[in-house]
Amino acid sequence: MIINYKALLDKDDLISLFEWGELSEGGQRNKANKVMKSIREQYKKDKGIDWKDTFIYRNISQNVIPTETFLKCCPEFKKSFRR
C-alpha cells in the first residue's frame, strides 16, 4: 500500500500500511493502538519528552503518531510513502 507522506499518522493509516483489512474492526483498532503506544514510547526515548506534552490539546496526541519516529522504528515501510 502506498500512501501520501504526512507528518502525523492516524489509526486508519496504520491499518492500511500493515494491511489488517481481514481483521475485525475491533482487532484492527487494537493492533493499531499497540503500535501507536510503542511509537510514543520510542519518541520519548529519542526526544526526552512525552509525545502528549508536544500538543496544546491532549486529545490530538492520543489519535496520531509522528511519521518520522514510525519510520525509524519500522524502516521497511519507507517505500510505502509517496512524497
Residues covered by each model-derived region:
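Major-groove DNA-recognition helix of helix-turn-helix-type DNA-binding domains
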Residues: 17-68, 77
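Short, amphipathic alpha-helical "recognition" segments used to contact nucleic acids or chromatin
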Residues: 1-7
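Helix-turn-helix/homeodomain-like alpha-helical modules used for DNA recognition
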Residues: 72-83
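Residues in the recognition helix of alpha-helical DNA-binding motifs
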Residues: 5, 35, 73
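Residues within the helices of the helix-turn-helix
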Residues: 11-12
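Polar low-complexity intrinsically disordered regions
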Residues: 1, 45-49, 83
